[in-house]
């Protein structure tokens, strides 16, 4: 995780093979968005390692940039995930787990499809990854500083293909995300809680 607004977090210690190594982030060595992005990236890795521990994408390298001097957005590009500072009514996007999961999801989509697809496929697939990990249909809850409830998108929706396509990838992506969300809810309803 690289801090674009100042020195990046620094931690040193001795790692011994075969023994878990604890990285103790504190406010003294890192700022909040650095810690939150680091934690969220590791959460995505754990989520997918539980599904497929040897999946090649998880063995790769992903770089994160936080506190970019822009506001109200985040993005994935070329094996990097990038998060903007707070401002203009928006929170620091590196401090919103759902946004971090979503941007990481673009890397997964690119790995599987080779690009982000068309008609919002990359956005919808990235949203549903965040939905699965957070367990809620809202993407980016807390994105707007004056509204910590609705977030930026909701995968629990009634949008349908092709009639609800409007050409905006974030809107159109809600169609496939809605399909996945509804399917996941039905699957969960049919399984015992422990599964």
Residue spans for each PLM region:
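Catalytic cores of large soluble enzymes that bind and process phosphate-bearing ligands
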Residues: 29-36, 92, 121, 168, ...
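Active-site-proximal alpha-helical
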Residues: 152-195
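Active-site recognition of the HExxH zinc-binding catalytic motif
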Residues: 98-111, 123-127, 131
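Post-HExxH zinc-binding segment in Zn-dependent metallohydrolases
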Residues: 119-161
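Acidic/polar low-complexity interaction segments
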Residues: 1-50, 54-62, 66-88, 110, ...
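Short pre-active-site segment immediately N-terminal to the catalytic Zn-binding motif
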Residues: 35, 83-100, 113-117
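Surface-exposed patches in mature extracellular/periplasmic domains of secreted proteins
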Residues: 52-66, 115-121, 137-145, 191-195
């Amino acid at each position: 995780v690289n801090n674009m607004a100042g020195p990046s977090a620094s931690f040193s210690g001795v790692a011994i093979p075969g023994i878990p190594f604890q990285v103790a982030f504190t406010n003294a060595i890192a700022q909040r968005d650095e810690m939150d992005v680091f934690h969220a990236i590791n959460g995505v890795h754990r989520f997918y390692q539980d599904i497929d521990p040897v999946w090649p994408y998880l063995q790769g390298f992903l770089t994160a940039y936080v506190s970019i001097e822009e506001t109200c957005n985040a993005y994935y590009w070329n094996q990097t995930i990038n998060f903007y500072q707070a401002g203009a009514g928006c929170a620091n996007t590196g401090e919103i787990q759902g946004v971090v999961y979503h941007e990481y999801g673009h890397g997964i989509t690119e790995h599987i499809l080779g690009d982000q697809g068309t008609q919002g496929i990359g956005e919808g697939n990235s949203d549903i990854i965040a939905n699965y990990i957070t367990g809620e249909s809202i993407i980016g809850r807390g994105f707007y500083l004056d509204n910590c409830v609705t977030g930026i998108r909701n995968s629990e929706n009634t949008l349908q293909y092709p009639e609800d396509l409007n050409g905006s990838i974030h809107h159109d992506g809600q169609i496939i995300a809605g399909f996945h969300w509804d399917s996941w809810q039905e699957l969960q309803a049919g399984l015992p809680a422990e599964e």
